[in-house]
Amino acid sequence: INAFGFTGRPNVDEGELKPELCYELNTFAPLKLSTICQCFNINYIHISSGCIYTNYEKEYNEYDEPNFGFFNSESSTYSKSKHAFEIGCDYGLTIRVRMPFCDKLHNRSYLTKIKKYDNLINLTNSKTYIPQLLDFIEQFVSEKIEAKDKDIVNFVQPNPLATDKVIELMKEYNLGNSEWSWVQFEELNCIANRSNCILSTNKLKNKYEFDAMDEELAIRAALNNILMDE
């Protein structure tokens, strides 16, 4: 189970400054691992990213050609490197996640980032609740499900929320930020473009028979656990 990769610090803009490292950790090293696993007939699960699509034309499924990936000159190095892995990999299960959040105020959690940011953009994006992702992966171990044939699955929560709704929930749980203000993306002076999209969960539900929590319920669960942990 491969969970390492390059996301950049503090964000994906670092990928534009360190493209070689970004490709090494997001493309070449995971491909080497998949080859080794294939040679030894070992199950391989690679945790990747759904940030290879953008815009709201549809809910993107696993069979849609990425429009914010390797072949789009406007996409970020991060997104290109994630798509490049999918192009090159012919073994194991690739799990696409987006904007992960968990039950703690971890500095890489979406909820922590939102709490700390003063400037917010109101967009709707698919997100991944890490405890449920771990439950999904654990099934492959405990039930000895094979992960050898090439496959891709989106693991995100159904019915994603816009940022303003997430803010309402955080305020409800007294985890707000008095400095929050709304801005446009252009005002942030980012180096790299960003992926904004909604991913389909039909394959997760129908093929893998996993019922992911609606995003609002997942966020409420996380916020409850954060409060209990404080």
Regions picked out by a protein language model, each given a short descriptive name:
Residues 17-24, 28-32, 51-95, 102:
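Catalytic helix-loop patch of NAD(P)-dependent Rossmann-fold dehydrogenases
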Residues 136-196, 230:
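Mid/C-terminal beta-alpha module of Rossmann-like enzyme folds, strongest
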Residues 213-230:
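Amphipathic terminal alpha-helices
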